[in-house]
């Protein structure tokens, strides 16, 4: 499969963030082809914050997912040998966006992050804090006011940024038709490397 893909000119996408939005990109092996209006995807309107969508988001990154993302040096946040070591989970809550693997910002939208979505100002930021954000987006607890956001049982306070089509205005989110990638070249390489390692060809696995 690897040799077949290489022979067909399939290769890794240079920019990670382009993998999900570049249709028929160099890394695509098996896609689900979408084309508005005949076939659209629910991805955009089920992952965006409600204030810029047509409904509340139903697919959200969890805190466990955010914690699991490596730091800039590839190590976990609680690894004492990491240059970016964070002592505990409570400390990470206050700095989870700092010194992370660059892919983190290509995957997660979080409170206070710049969000250049169509229909908003060029420097628009997405908030979910009580008293600051749109009520539809609010998440968390205000202990001083003894108030909880009404969305705490609906979503996690994080949103998916991956594969977002930020050129779509709020009224167009249901026309999202970017192809969905079922398999990309990186997965073929991982499978090849795993098979090589399991059959005693560790050097091939490392090179892959």
Q: Where on the chain are the PLM-derived regions?
A:
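An aromatic- and glycine-enriched ligand-binding surface/loop that stacks and positions planar moieties
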Residues: 1-140
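Acidic, serine/threonine- and proline-rich low-complexity regulatory regions
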Residues: 12-16, 169-177, 197
């Amino acid at each position: 499969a690897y040799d077949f893909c290489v022979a067909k000119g399939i290769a890794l996408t240079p920019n990670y963030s382009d993998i999900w939005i570049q249709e028929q990109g160099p890394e695509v092996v098996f896609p689900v082809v979408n084309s508005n209006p005949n076939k659209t995807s629910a991805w955009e309107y089920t992952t965006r914050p409600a204030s810029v969508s047509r409904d509340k988001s139903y697919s959200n990154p969890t805190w466990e997912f955010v914690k699991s993302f490596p730091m800039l040096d590839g190590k976990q946040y609680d690894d004492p040998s990491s240059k970016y070591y964070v002592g505990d989970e409570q400390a990470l809550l206050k700095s989870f966006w700092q010194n992370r693997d660059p892919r983190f910002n290509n995957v997660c939208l979080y409170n206070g992050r710049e969000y250049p979505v169509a229909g908003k100002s060029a420097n628009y930021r997405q908030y979910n804090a009580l008293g600051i954000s749109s009520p539809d987006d609010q998440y968390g607890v205000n202990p001083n006011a003894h108030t909880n956001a009404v969305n705490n049982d609906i979503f996690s306070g994080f949103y998916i940024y991956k594969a977002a089509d930020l050129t779509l205005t709020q009224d167009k989110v249901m026309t999202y038709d970017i192809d969905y990638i079922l398999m990309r070249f990186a997965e073929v390489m991982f499978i090849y490397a795993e098979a090589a390692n399991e059959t005693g060809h560790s050097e091939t696995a490392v090179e892959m």
